[in-house]
């Protein structure tokens, strides 16, 4: 009898308070989504990209990653040209040459059309300098020098120190062929979330999901026990 009355109360609430029912369903869906996302974050502790990386830099470097960087045949001094210089730190693979334990610098000039730019930006030149750190210091600093309209307007996700930007001593050639900068990189630019960040984010999302699901259950139980139709509702049905 009690279960029938509770079901009847829920049916009356559904019939006479649709906005409340819709709000409860929305909270329930959000809670279930939070449970699923939180569980995913807690079980996948590696390989997730940081959402704070600007997508325009990702697209720019993916286009740049289709090119080959050709080292100079002899040691020369390169001058940074262009009113705007941006430096960012990436993880690149330049091969295991005999000088892999030394900091090396490679330089190339590219046109906007080579990285997918159109219009007036297609003919603009960009001077790219890569400073490959020694094995003890992982990471490669990439410096882009050119007019501001060619480079992405947002700040680079991982800035690189501009120490020694004025002049760059270029290293000798590392073999007979040009070097494919991103030949071994699946993602051109990515900053992975650490396991601590994933655990913190996953636990908070999971807790929020549990809270929303419990809130929906509490609303349903309260409605089933406490909701009663107004007396005038029965009188109106009797008159009809």
Curated annotation (Swiss-Prot):
Cellular compartments per GO CC: plasma membrane
Key word Transmembrane helix present: yes
Signal peptide: 1-38
Subunit structure of this chain's protein: Interacts with IGFBP3. Interacts with CASP8.
Membrane topology reported for the UniProt record: Single-pass membrane protein
Matches recorded under InterPro entries: TMEM248/TMEM219, TMEM248/TMEM219_dom
Top-rank lineage group of the source organism: Eukaryota
Encoding gene, per UniProt annotation: Tmem219
UniProt keyword list: Apoptosis, Cell membrane, Glycoprotein, Membrane, Receptor, Signal, Transmembrane, Transmembrane helix
Transmembrane segments: 205-225
Example of a GO biological process term: apoptotic process
Organism: Mus musculus (Mouse)
Localization (cell): Cell membrane
Glycosylation sites: 167
Membrane side Extracellular: residue ranges: 39-204
Protein name per its UniProtKB record: Insulin-like growth factor-binding protein 3 receptor
Job of this protein: Cell death receptor specific for IGFBP3, may mediate caspase-8-dependent apoptosis upon ligand binding.
Cytoplasmic topology ranges: 226-240
């Amino acid at each position: 009898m009690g279960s029938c009355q509770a079901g009847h109360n829920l049916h009356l609430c559904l019939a006479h308070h649709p906005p409340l029912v819709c709000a409860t369903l929305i909270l329930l869906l959000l809670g279930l989504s939070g449970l699923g996302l939180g569980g995913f974050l807690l079980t996948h502790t590696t390989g997730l990209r940081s959402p704070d990386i600007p997508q325009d830099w990702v697209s720019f470097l993916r286009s740049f990653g289709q090119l080959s960087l050709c080292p100079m045949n002899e040691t020369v001094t390169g001058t940074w040209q262009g009113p705007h210089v941006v430096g960012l730190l990436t993880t690149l693979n330049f091969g295991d040459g005999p000088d892999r334990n030394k900091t090396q610098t490679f330089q190339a000039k590219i046109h906007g059309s080579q990285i997918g730019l159109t219009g007036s930006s297609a003919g603009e030149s960009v001077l790219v300098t890569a400073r490959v750190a020694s094995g003890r210091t992982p990471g490669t600093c990439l410096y882009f020098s050119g007019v501001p309209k060619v480079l992405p307007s947002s700040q680079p996700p991982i800035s690189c120190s501009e120490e020694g930007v004025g002049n760059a001593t270029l290293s000798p050639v590392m073999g007979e062929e040009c070097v494919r900068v991103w030949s071994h990189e699946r993602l051109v630019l990515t900053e992975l979330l650490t396991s601590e960040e994933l655990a913190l984010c996953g636990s908070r999302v999971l807790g929020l999901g549990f809270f929303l699901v419990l809130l929906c259950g509490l609303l349903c139980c309260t409605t089933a026990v406490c909701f009663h139709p107004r007396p005038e509702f029965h009188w109106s049905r009797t008159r009809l």
